[in-house]
Amino acid sequence: MIGMGETIMDIIFRNGQPQAAVHGGSSFNSIVSVGRAGVPCVFVGDTGADIVGRQTLDFMRANHVDTDYCPMRPDVKSAVSLAYLDDNGDASYVFYKQKPEAPKEWTLPQIGADDVLLYGSYFSSCRGMRPLVEDMLSHATAGGAIIYYDINFRSSHSHELVALLPTIEDNCRRSSIVRGSADDFEVLFGQRDAATIYDRHIRKLCPVFICTSGAGAVTVCLPHDTLRFPVPRVDDVASTVGAGDNFNAGLACSLIWRGIRKDMLPALGSEEWQHLLATACAFSGNACRTLDNYISVEFGLRASGLPV
């Protein structure tokens, strides 16, 4: 699996007091969980040439993530976020980071039909990173990989929506799976109903659409059907910061473990999707039980034995 995105240091607060500092970033969180689950993986991105950047790379390597395509850049300061948790473990954020800009040159990992590329968030739609993102998407398309796009559009970027929407639509068009939350689509389209969003906005761009809604049902919209699956209850929630990222990680791992390729996706039936989403929800639920942004090491060691 290949993850592409930003790296950031999350400082997590509860009741106004710092509780933990954890390495983060949407695709970053996913790829760490994939590495802990024993799936070969690589991260494409960058970090600053500073102590935070060095710790970030060391952390990825310790979790079996290839960092050959994530350079430390002297022109970049590592990003930091403050995540303030409410009583439900949901976070509101304050970000301290530079405007994203692609490096002057880069190399990309090999990618083939058995692989999954995961990307998304503001990183994938902002102008500064577009040259790198477009090159990676073309590379993954040529290799026949599953391209998994998590829109993950935060309300903090709503003032840029008009400028970013054409790029978001282009990302959808070039992807095999589009996922987003009901919150994302309320900001983007003023809609929360998955079937309506699919019919009006996604179907013409990408055949496979997954809409999550926190503890609510997961909806999978396909050309031939709309499927809804309940989400297992998680009682001991510590933080939901990595919930969606780990849903992505679990789904990607399950696709790889089950040998599902790009051309098989639109025709998958309800039973197959139930297997895929069970693993996705198991990853997400485990990550919600701690202040970390990823599955636990212990869960990762037994993850491949889940009923995938």
PLM regions and their residue ranges:
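Short catalytic helix/loop segments, enriched in acidic residues and glycine
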Residues: 17-32
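Active-site metal-binding loops of divalent metal-dependent hydrolases
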Residues: 5-7, 26, 122, 151, ...
